[in-house]
Design a protein with these regions (language model features):
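Enzyme catalytic cores with a strong preference for nitrogen-chemistry domains
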Residues: 1-259
Length: 259
């Protein structure tokens, strides 16, 4: 499972260029090219992109596998404080309500919403959900519902900037969330090349399993990939052992196949 940063297809710091038809019109062709170039790969990966739907613009994560769009997840919590002003350009997924949506993207009918779980047919414990950056930092993150619904892993596409002490807090947040939810947590933030306007990014990568940080890169390092393994069978055992871990129904499960 490869997790890429938030809005990586266009860049996070585009500002009011997100209102540009030229920029938004280039998103789908770029995504179609990614689908074409990765059709022979077995890796599942997430791509951050802006997406228009129902007359509104959403900050989204597209889940891609073997040339197929498995689903698109819009961001729920949009920061609008300090150096962040996402509500200026984007709408929250909360405006979708509890309705079930599909959209047409790159010639495919694609599930759209925050109610999506992605499950491997050959590996029943390999089920994951997706949230985006600020979704993790709120009191009731979407990952709570996703893991209760069966997700063993959460992928977080992020563009979290650097200020004094923030990396330590981010590390603690990812570790604590993976412990509380008995899950694997993959966190991928934007790289230094995104450092424009009034924010600095360090390419902070974190991978945690049930409270333990398994892998982390050095901030501002040149290495672009942080790789490790998550023991999903151990996570499932922990959930079975902890009988207070209640299941949550009502999520859509998108099944994919691995060779």
């Amino acid at each position: 499972l490869l997790t890429l940063p938030e809005l990586c297809l266009t860049g996070y710091t585009c500002g009011d260029l997100f209102f540009s038809d030229c920029l938004l019109g280039a998103v789908e062709p770029a995504l179609a090219r990614i689908l074409e170039q990765t059709a022979a790969l077995s890796t599942v990966f997430t791509v951050g992109l802006p997406l228009r739907f129902g007359g509104k613009l959403y900050n989204c994560a597209a889940v891609v596998h073997a040339g197929r769009l498995l689903g698109v997840v819009p961001k729920t919590y949009l920061p609008n404080y300090g150096e962040f002003y996402e509500q200026r350009q984007f709408s929250s997924a909360s405006v979708l309500g509890g309705n079930i949506y599909d959209l047409t993207l790159c010639g495919q009918s694609v599930p759209f919403g925050t109610d999506l779980l992605f499950a491997c047919a050959e590996l029943p414990d390999y089920t994951f959900g997706v949230e985006l950056c600020e979704d993790l930092w709120v009191p009731c993150p979407p990952s709570t519902r996703l893991t209760a619904g069966g997700a063993a892993i959460i992928a977080n596409l992020s563009a979290s900037d650097e200020v004094i002490g923030k990396a330590d807090y981010r590390r603690m947040l990812v570790s604590a969330t993976s412990a509380r939810l008995a899950c694997g947590y993959i966190y991928c933030s934007a790289s230094p090349t995104e450092s424009t306007q009034d924010m600095v990014f360090s390419r902070h990568h974190l991978i945690a399993e049930n409270g333990t940080i398994l892998a982390e890169n050095e901030p501002f390092a040149d290495a672009e990939l942080t790789i490790t393994e998550i023991d999903v069978q151990r996570l499932m055992h922990e959930r079975h052992r902890t009988t207070s871990y209640d299941a949550v129904p009502g999520l859509r499960q998108i099944v994919f196949h691995q060779p």
